Protein backbone atom coordinates (compact mmCIF):
# COMPACT_ATOMS: atom_id res chain seq x y z
CA UNK A 1 0.00 0.00 0.00
CA UNK A 2 2.78 2.44 0.88
CA UNK A 3 4.41 1.89 -2.50
CA UNK A 4 1.16 2.96 -4.22
CA UNK A 5 0.81 6.10 -2.11
CA UNK A 6 4.46 6.99 -2.75
CA UNK A 7 4.19 6.53 -6.53
CA UNK A 8 3.67 10.12 -7.73
CA UNK A 9 1.89 9.31 -10.99
CA UNK A 10 -1.10 7.64 -9.25
CA UNK A 11 -0.82 8.85 -5.65
CA UNK A 12 -3.28 11.77 -5.97
CA UNK A 13 -6.21 9.58 -7.00
CA UNK A 14 -5.14 6.70 -4.75
CA UNK A 15 -5.18 9.00 -1.71
CA UNK A 16 -8.67 10.29 -2.53
CA UNK A 17 -9.95 6.73 -2.93
CA UNK A 18 -8.19 5.68 0.27
CA UNK A 19 -9.73 8.58 2.21
CA UNK A 20 -13.20 7.36 1.26
CA UNK A 21 -12.02 3.74 1.79
CA UNK A 22 -12.90 2.67 -1.77
CA UNK A 23 -9.50 0.96 -2.05
CA UNK A 24 -6.51 0.22 0.21
CA UNK A 25 -8.65 0.16 3.36
CA UNK A 26 -12.14 -0.81 4.49
CA UNK A 27 -14.04 1.23 7.08
CA UNK A 28 -17.29 3.16 7.57
CA UNK A 29 -16.23 6.04 5.29
CA UNK A 30 -17.13 3.87 2.30
CA UNK A 31 -20.74 3.56 3.37
CA UNK A 32 -21.03 7.19 4.51
CA UNK A 33 -20.48 8.24 0.90
CA UNK A 34 -21.89 5.44 -1.26
CA UNK A 35 -25.23 4.76 0.46
CA UNK A 36 -26.53 8.37 0.79
CA UNK A 37 -25.40 9.32 -2.74
CA UNK A 38 -27.04 6.17 -4.15
CA UNK A 39 -30.31 6.97 -2.35
CA UNK A 40 -30.20 10.56 -3.59
CA UNK A 41 -29.63 9.32 -7.15
CA UNK A 42 -32.66 7.03 -6.86
CA UNK A 43 -34.87 9.95 -5.81
CA UNK A 44 -33.44 12.01 -8.69
CA UNK A 45 -34.63 9.39 -11.18
CA UNK A 46 -38.04 9.30 -9.46
CA UNK A 47 -38.27 13.05 -9.97
CA UNK A 48 -37.65 12.60 -13.70
CA UNK A 49 -40.90 10.66 -13.97
CA UNK A 50 -42.84 13.35 -12.13
CA UNK A 51 -41.34 16.13 -14.28
CA UNK A 52 -42.32 14.52 -17.58
CA UNK A 53 -43.91 17.02 -19.94
CA UNK A 54 -41.65 19.99 -19.24
CA UNK A 55 -38.80 18.99 -21.54
CA UNK A 56 -36.44 21.76 -20.34
CA UNK A 57 -36.82 20.63 -16.76
CA UNK A 58 -36.46 16.97 -17.73
CA UNK A 59 -33.22 17.57 -19.66
CA UNK A 60 -31.55 19.49 -16.82
CA UNK A 61 -32.67 17.00 -14.18
CA UNK A 62 -31.75 14.11 -16.49
CA UNK A 63 -28.23 15.50 -16.84
CA UNK A 64 -27.65 15.46 -13.08
CA UNK A 65 -29.35 12.08 -12.66
CA UNK A 66 -27.08 10.54 -15.31
CA UNK A 67 -24.03 12.26 -13.81
CA UNK A 68 -24.70 10.85 -10.36
CA UNK A 69 -25.65 7.45 -11.77
CA UNK A 70 -22.25 7.27 -13.47
CA UNK A 71 -20.55 8.34 -10.23
CA UNK A 72 -22.31 5.59 -8.28
CA UNK A 73 -21.63 3.01 -11.00
CA UNK A 74 -17.93 3.90 -11.13
CA UNK A 75 -17.63 3.60 -7.37
CA UNK A 76 -19.52 0.32 -7.09
CA UNK A 77 -17.34 -1.23 -9.79
CA UNK A 78 -14.24 0.17 -8.08
CA UNK A 79 -15.24 -1.30 -4.71
CA UNK A 80 -16.28 -4.63 -6.25
CA UNK A 81 -12.96 -4.98 -8.12
CA UNK A 82 -10.82 -3.18 -5.55
CA UNK A 83 -8.27 -6.04 -5.41
CA UNK A 84 -7.79 -5.80 -9.17
CA UNK A 85 -7.31 -2.04 -8.95
CA UNK A 86 -4.93 -2.37 -6.00
CA UNK A 87 -2.84 -5.00 -7.79
CA UNK A 88 -2.83 -2.87 -10.94
CA UNK A 89 -1.62 0.21 -9.05
CA UNK A 90 0.94 -1.93 -7.23
CA UNK A 91 2.28 -3.00 -10.62
CA UNK A 92 2.40 0.63 -11.76
CA UNK A 93 4.42 1.53 -8.67
CA UNK A 94 6.88 -1.30 -9.31
CA UNK A 95 7.38 -0.41 -12.98
CA UNK A 96 7.54 3.32 -12.20
CA UNK A 97 10.46 2.97 -9.81
CA UNK A 98 12.13 0.50 -12.18
CA UNK A 99 12.03 3.09 -14.98
CA UNK A 100 13.22 5.81 -12.58
CA UNK A 101 16.47 3.85 -12.10
CA UNK A 102 17.31 3.73 -15.82
CA UNK A 103 20.48 5.70 -16.51
CA UNK A 104 19.24 7.70 -19.49
CA UNK A 105 18.70 11.45 -19.34
CA UNK A 106 16.01 11.44 -22.04
CA UNK A 107 13.99 8.70 -20.31
CA UNK A 108 14.22 10.48 -16.94
CA UNK A 109 13.11 13.76 -18.53
CA UNK A 110 10.18 11.92 -20.14
CA UNK A 111 9.21 10.32 -16.81
CA UNK A 112 9.28 13.65 -14.97
CA UNK A 113 7.28 15.38 -17.70
CA UNK A 114 4.48 12.79 -17.78
CA UNK A 115 4.39 12.51 -13.99
CA UNK A 116 3.97 16.28 -13.66
CA UNK A 117 1.27 16.22 -16.32
CA UNK A 118 -0.63 13.40 -14.60
CA UNK A 119 -0.46 15.08 -11.19
CA UNK A 120 -1.48 18.49 -12.55
CA UNK A 121 -4.45 16.97 -14.38
CA UNK A 122 -5.56 15.05 -11.27
CA UNK A 123 -5.29 18.06 -8.97
CA UNK A 124 -6.85 20.50 -11.45
CA UNK A 125 -9.74 18.09 -12.11
CA UNK A 126 -10.48 17.92 -8.39
CA UNK A 127 -10.23 21.71 -8.03
CA UNK A 128 -12.40 22.35 -11.09
CA UNK A 129 -14.92 19.77 -9.87
CA UNK A 130 -15.10 21.48 -6.48
CA UNK A 131 -15.66 24.90 -8.09
CA UNK A 132 -18.33 23.66 -10.50
CA UNK A 133 -20.06 21.66 -7.75
CA UNK A 134 -20.16 24.79 -5.61
CA UNK A 135 -21.79 26.66 -8.51
CA UNK A 136 -24.38 23.87 -8.84
CA UNK A 137 -25.32 24.12 -5.18
CA UNK A 138 -25.51 27.92 -4.86
CA UNK A 139 -27.21 28.68 -8.20
CA UNK A 140 -30.79 28.05 -6.91
CA UNK A 141 -30.29 30.75 -4.27
CA UNK A 142 -30.11 33.41 -6.99
CA UNK A 143 -33.10 32.35 -9.07
CA UNK A 144 -35.69 34.14 -6.93
CA UNK A 145 -37.79 30.98 -6.47
CA UNK A 146 -37.49 27.93 -4.28
CA UNK A 147 -35.40 25.39 -6.09
CA UNK A 148 -33.01 22.56 -5.30
CA UNK A 149 -29.56 21.98 -6.78
CA UNK A 150 -30.80 18.60 -8.05
CA UNK A 151 -34.41 17.63 -8.60
CA UNK A 152 -35.62 15.00 -6.12
CA UNK A 153 -38.99 13.38 -5.51
CA UNK A 154 -39.43 11.70 -2.13
CA UNK A 155 -42.82 9.96 -1.87
CA UNK A 156 -44.97 11.50 0.86
CA UNK A 157 -42.68 14.50 1.35
CA UNK A 158 -43.27 18.00 -0.02
CA UNK A 159 -39.70 19.05 -0.72
CA UNK A 160 -40.58 22.72 -1.26
CA UNK A 161 -42.21 23.38 2.13
CA UNK A 162 -40.30 24.33 5.27
CA UNK A 163 -38.53 22.73 7.04
CA UNK A 164 -38.28 19.87 4.51
CA UNK A 165 -36.92 22.22 1.85
CA UNK A 166 -34.05 23.47 4.01
CA UNK A 167 -33.18 19.94 5.17
CA UNK A 168 -33.14 18.51 1.62
CA UNK A 169 -31.13 21.46 0.33
CA UNK A 170 -28.55 21.00 3.10
CA UNK A 171 -28.34 17.25 2.44
CA UNK A 172 -27.74 17.85 -1.26
CA UNK A 173 -25.02 20.40 -0.52
CA UNK A 174 -23.29 17.96 1.86
CA UNK A 175 -23.53 15.02 -0.57
CA UNK A 176 -22.18 17.02 -3.49
CA UNK A 177 -18.59 16.72 -2.23
CA UNK A 178 -18.52 12.91 -1.87
CA UNK A 179 -20.37 12.67 -5.18
CA UNK A 180 -17.59 14.73 -6.75
CA UNK A 181 -14.97 12.43 -5.20
CA UNK A 182 -16.82 9.37 -6.50
CA UNK A 183 -16.82 10.67 -10.06
CA UNK A 184 -13.75 12.78 -10.84
CA UNK A 185 -10.86 10.61 -9.54
CA UNK A 186 -11.83 7.80 -11.92
CA UNK A 187 -11.37 10.11 -14.91
CA UNK A 188 -8.02 11.24 -13.50
CA UNK A 189 -7.07 7.60 -12.84
CA UNK A 190 -7.78 6.76 -16.48
CA UNK A 191 -5.68 9.69 -17.70
CA UNK A 192 -2.81 8.95 -15.29
CA UNK A 193 -2.64 5.26 -16.18
CA UNK A 194 -2.74 5.93 -19.92
CA UNK A 195 0.03 8.50 -19.44
CA UNK A 196 2.10 5.88 -17.64
CA UNK A 197 1.39 3.50 -20.51
CA UNK A 198 2.85 6.17 -22.80
CA UNK A 199 5.90 6.42 -20.53
CA UNK A 200 6.51 2.68 -20.88
CA UNK A 201 5.99 2.75 -24.65
CA UNK A 202 8.29 5.73 -25.21
CA UNK A 203 10.91 4.18 -22.91
CA UNK A 204 10.83 1.03 -25.03
CA UNK A 205 11.14 3.12 -28.20
CA UNK A 206 14.18 4.89 -26.78
CA UNK A 207 15.84 1.65 -25.73
CA UNK A 208 15.19 0.04 -29.11
CA UNK A 209 17.09 2.91 -30.72
CA UNK A 210 20.01 2.86 -28.27
CA UNK A 211 20.30 -0.71 -26.94
CA UNK A 212 23.69 -1.23 -28.65
CA UNK A 213 25.26 1.86 -27.06
CA UNK A 214 28.25 0.73 -25.02
CA UNK A 215 28.27 -2.72 -26.63
CA UNK A 216 31.15 -3.53 -28.96
CA UNK A 217 30.57 -4.66 -32.53
CA UNK A 218 31.65 -8.22 -31.64
CA UNK A 219 29.64 -8.53 -28.42
CA UNK A 220 26.61 -10.13 -30.04
CA UNK A 221 25.78 -12.14 -26.92
CA UNK A 222 25.24 -8.98 -24.87
CA UNK A 223 23.20 -7.46 -27.70
CA UNK A 224 21.09 -10.62 -27.83
CA UNK A 225 20.40 -10.38 -24.08
CA UNK A 226 19.41 -6.73 -24.49
CA UNK A 227 16.95 -7.56 -27.27
CA UNK A 228 15.44 -10.39 -25.22
CA UNK A 229 14.94 -7.90 -22.36
CA UNK A 230 13.24 -5.48 -24.79
CA UNK A 231 10.90 -8.25 -25.97
CA UNK A 232 9.96 -8.93 -22.34
CA UNK A 233 9.32 -5.20 -21.81
CA UNK A 234 7.11 -5.14 -24.90
CA UNK A 235 5.10 -8.11 -23.59
CA UNK A 236 4.76 -6.33 -20.25
CA UNK A 237 3.38 -3.23 -21.97
CA UNK A 238 0.90 -5.37 -23.93
CA UNK A 239 -0.28 -6.98 -20.67
CA UNK A 240 -0.49 -3.55 -19.00
CA UNK A 241 -2.77 -2.06 -21.67
CA UNK A 242 -4.89 -5.22 -21.71
CA UNK A 243 -5.35 -5.06 -17.92
CA UNK A 244 -6.18 -1.35 -18.05
CA UNK A 245 -8.74 -2.03 -20.76
CA UNK A 246 -10.40 -4.75 -18.68
CA UNK A 247 -10.76 -2.31 -15.76
CA UNK A 248 -12.31 0.59 -17.70
CA UNK A 249 -13.96 -0.76 -20.87
CA UNK A 250 -17.50 -1.20 -19.54
CA UNK A 251 -17.48 2.12 -17.70
CA UNK A 252 -16.39 3.73 -20.98
CA UNK A 253 -19.32 1.98 -22.67
CA UNK A 254 -21.81 3.48 -20.20
CA UNK A 255 -20.20 6.90 -20.67
CA UNK A 256 -20.45 6.49 -24.44
CA UNK A 257 -24.19 5.79 -24.32
CA UNK A 258 -25.29 8.15 -21.55
CA UNK A 259 -23.27 11.23 -22.39
CA UNK A 260 -23.85 10.85 -26.12
CA UNK A 261 -27.59 11.10 -25.45
CA UNK A 262 -27.22 13.91 -22.91
CA UNK A 263 -25.02 15.92 -25.28
CA UNK A 264 -27.75 15.71 -27.91
CA UNK A 265 -30.42 16.77 -25.39
CA UNK A 266 -28.38 19.69 -24.05
CA UNK A 267 -27.65 20.98 -27.55
CA UNK A 268 -31.38 20.92 -28.19
CA UNK A 269 -32.06 22.73 -24.91
CA UNK A 270 -29.44 25.36 -25.76
CA UNK A 271 -31.31 26.01 -28.99
CA UNK A 272 -34.70 26.72 -27.38
CA UNK A 273 -34.01 28.51 -24.08
CA UNK A 274 -33.93 32.32 -24.02
CA UNK A 275 -32.77 33.10 -20.47
CA UNK A 276 -29.13 34.25 -20.64
CA UNK A 277 -28.22 32.74 -17.26
CA UNK A 278 -29.61 29.37 -18.33
CA UNK A 279 -27.71 29.58 -21.62
CA UNK A 280 -24.45 30.01 -19.70
CA UNK A 281 -25.31 27.11 -17.37
CA UNK A 282 -26.24 24.75 -20.23
CA UNK A 283 -23.12 25.75 -22.17
CA UNK A 284 -21.08 24.83 -19.07
CA UNK A 285 -22.82 21.42 -18.93
CA UNK A 286 -22.00 20.83 -22.61
CA UNK A 287 -18.36 21.82 -22.03
CA UNK A 288 -18.12 19.38 -19.12
CA UNK A 289 -19.48 16.50 -21.20
CA UNK A 290 -17.22 17.16 -24.18
CA UNK A 291 -14.09 17.68 -22.04
CA UNK A 292 -14.88 14.51 -20.07
CA UNK A 293 -15.27 12.36 -23.18
CA UNK A 294 -12.32 14.04 -24.93
CA UNK A 295 -10.00 13.25 -22.00
CA UNK A 296 -10.80 9.55 -22.41
CA UNK A 297 -10.50 9.39 -26.18
CA UNK A 298 -7.43 11.62 -26.59
CA UNK A 299 -5.23 9.64 -24.20
CA UNK A 300 -6.49 6.26 -25.43
CA UNK A 301 -5.73 7.38 -28.98
CA UNK A 302 -2.21 8.42 -27.95
CA UNK A 303 -1.54 4.94 -26.55
CA UNK A 304 -2.76 3.38 -29.79
CA UNK A 305 -0.64 5.59 -32.04
CA UNK A 306 2.54 5.34 -29.99
CA UNK A 307 2.24 1.55 -29.69
CA UNK A 308 2.48 1.31 -33.47
CA UNK A 309 5.52 3.61 -33.46
CA UNK A 310 7.39 0.88 -31.60
CA UNK A 311 7.90 -0.76 -35.00
CA UNK A 312 9.44 2.46 -36.36
CA UNK A 313 11.77 2.68 -33.35
CA UNK A 314 12.88 -0.94 -33.79
CA UNK A 315 13.58 -0.45 -37.48
CA UNK A 316 15.53 2.76 -36.87
CA UNK A 317 17.74 1.05 -34.28
CA UNK A 318 21.28 -0.34 -34.72
CA UNK A 319 20.32 -3.67 -36.30
CA UNK A 320 22.41 -3.67 -39.49
CA UNK A 321 25.56 -5.22 -38.00
CA UNK A 322 23.75 -7.72 -35.75
CA UNK A 323 23.53 -11.47 -36.19
CA UNK A 324 20.57 -12.89 -38.08
CA UNK A 325 19.17 -14.45 -34.88
CA UNK A 326 19.01 -11.02 -33.23
CA UNK A 327 17.51 -9.47 -36.35
CA UNK A 328 14.74 -12.08 -36.25
CA UNK A 329 13.96 -11.13 -32.65
CA UNK A 330 13.72 -7.48 -33.65
CA UNK A 331 11.49 -8.52 -36.53
CA UNK A 332 9.14 -10.17 -34.00
CA UNK A 333 8.85 -6.83 -32.17
CA UNK A 334 8.13 -5.05 -35.46
CA UNK A 335 5.49 -7.59 -36.47
CA UNK A 336 3.74 -7.47 -33.08
CA UNK A 337 3.75 -3.66 -33.10
CA UNK A 338 1.68 -3.71 -36.29
CA UNK A 339 -1.27 -4.69 -34.08
CA UNK A 340 -2.04 -1.54 -32.06
CA UNK A 341 -2.63 -1.62 -28.33
CA UNK A 342 -6.19 -0.41 -27.83
CA UNK A 343 -8.50 0.64 -25.03
CA UNK A 344 -12.01 -0.15 -26.15
CA UNK A 345 -15.61 0.86 -25.51
CA UNK A 346 -17.32 -2.24 -24.12
CA UNK A 347 -14.67 -4.44 -25.79
CA UNK A 348 -16.25 -3.49 -29.13
CA UNK A 349 -14.89 -0.23 -30.56
CA UNK A 350 -11.39 1.21 -30.03
CA UNK A 351 -11.26 4.60 -28.32
CA UNK A 352 -9.77 6.79 -31.03
CA UNK A 353 -10.20 10.39 -32.11
CA UNK A 354 -12.13 9.10 -35.13
CA UNK A 355 -14.55 7.39 -32.73
CA UNK A 356 -14.82 10.62 -30.71
CA UNK A 357 -15.65 12.53 -33.89
CA UNK A 358 -18.27 9.91 -34.81
CA UNK A 359 -19.88 10.34 -31.38
CA UNK A 360 -20.06 14.12 -31.83
CA UNK A 361 -21.46 13.71 -35.35
CA UNK A 362 -24.14 11.29 -34.14
CA UNK A 363 -25.15 13.61 -31.28
CA UNK A 364 -25.36 16.58 -33.64
CA UNK A 365 -27.41 14.57 -36.17
CA UNK A 366 -29.98 13.63 -33.52
CA UNK A 367 -29.97 17.24 -32.31
CA UNK A 368 -30.85 18.55 -35.79
CA UNK A 369 -33.60 15.94 -36.06
CA UNK A 370 -35.07 17.01 -32.70
CA UNK A 371 -34.89 20.67 -33.70
CA UNK A 372 -36.78 20.04 -36.94
CA UNK A 373 -39.49 18.07 -35.14
CA UNK A 374 -39.77 20.77 -32.46
CA UNK A 375 -39.98 23.60 -35.01
UniProtKB/Swiss-Prot annotation:
One Pfam family it belongs to = 7tm_6
* Residue ranges crossing the lipid bilayer per the database entry: 32-52, 58-78, 125-145, 167-187, 250-270, 279-299
GO cellular-component term (any):
plasma membrane
Disulphides:
none
Q: How does it sit in the membrane?
A: Multi-pass membrane protein
GO terms for MF: odorant binding; olfactory receptor activity
One of the GO biological process terms: signal transduction
Which tissues does the record link to its expression? Expressed in female antenna, maxillary palp and proboscis. Expressed in female body. Expressed in male tissues.
> Where is this protein chiefly located?
membrane
Q: Which phenotype arises from disrupting this gene?
A: RNAi-mediated knockdown does not affect mosquito blood feeding rate.
What UniProt keywords are attached to this protein's entry? Cell membrane, Membrane, Olfaction, Receptor, Sensory transduction, Transducer, Transmembrane, Transmembrane helix
Localization in the cell: Cell membrane
Q: What does this protein do?
A: Odorant receptor which complexes with Orco, a coreceptor, to form odorant-sensing units, providing sensitive and prolonged odorant signaling and calcium permeability. Can sense indole, 1-octen-3-ol, 3-methyindole and an insect repellent DEET.
Family to which this protein belongs = Belongs to the insect chemoreceptor superfamily. Heteromeric odorant receptor channel (TC 1.A.69) family.
Protein name per the record: Odorant receptor 10
Which source organism?
Answer: Aedes albopictus (Asian tiger mosquito)
